[in-house]
């Protein structure tokens, strides 16, 4: 979405199928379920890589996620919604699924939507600033964590991030 030119020349055979297979293998290694999202949060033609101008899910999802960050529930929300999206939950975006996730986190979906709407400009500005900071560190992919000017992209480097945090005193089981 942010970098549509990234997908120029990529297609199902040269990019999407190998990436999906890699995601599946990584999930299997971690004992996690991985299934193709139904629907995918990003509306994109997997044969051509072209990103659609119509995006019914990703912006609301990102705004809700940023709102959860403001409530100190960002990681928990990301965990729950990712498991829903990539764990085979059909129609993950529908209210019954989102209500369930919010309830598990101890928040009300409607209150979060109202909070998001009231703070939309600030939330968008925060997301844009995050994108600027990602590019400044030398990466634009997601999920991405930056710690001490080093980026940790995707699930493959999560253990490296935890090791760095532990060196600095993080207590983590």
PLM-predicted stretches and their roles:
Residues 76-173:
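C-terminal cap of thioredoxin/glutaredoxin-like
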């Amino acid at each position: 979405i942010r970098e549509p030119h990234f997908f120029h020349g990529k297609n199902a055979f040269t990019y999407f199928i190998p990436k999906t297979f890699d995601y599946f293998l990584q999930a299997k290694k971690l004992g996690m379920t991985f299934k193709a999202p139904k629907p995918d949060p990003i509306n994109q033609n997997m044969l051509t890589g072209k990103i659609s101008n119509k995006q019914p899910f990703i912006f609301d999802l990102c705004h809700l996620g940023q709102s959860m960050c403001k409530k100190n529930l960002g990681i928990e929300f990301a965990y729950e919604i990712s498991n829903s999206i990539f764990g085979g939950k059909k129609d993950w975006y529908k209210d019954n699924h989102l209500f369930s996730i919010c309830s598990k986190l101890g928040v009300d979906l409607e209150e979060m939507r109202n909070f998001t709407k009231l703070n939309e400009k600030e939330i968008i500005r925060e997301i844009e600033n995050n994108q600027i900071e990602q590019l400044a560190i030398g990466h634009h992919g997601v999920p991405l964590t930056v710690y001490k000017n080093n980026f940790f992209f995707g699930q493959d480097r999560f253990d490296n991030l935890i090791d760095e945090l532990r060196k600095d005193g993080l207590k983590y089981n």
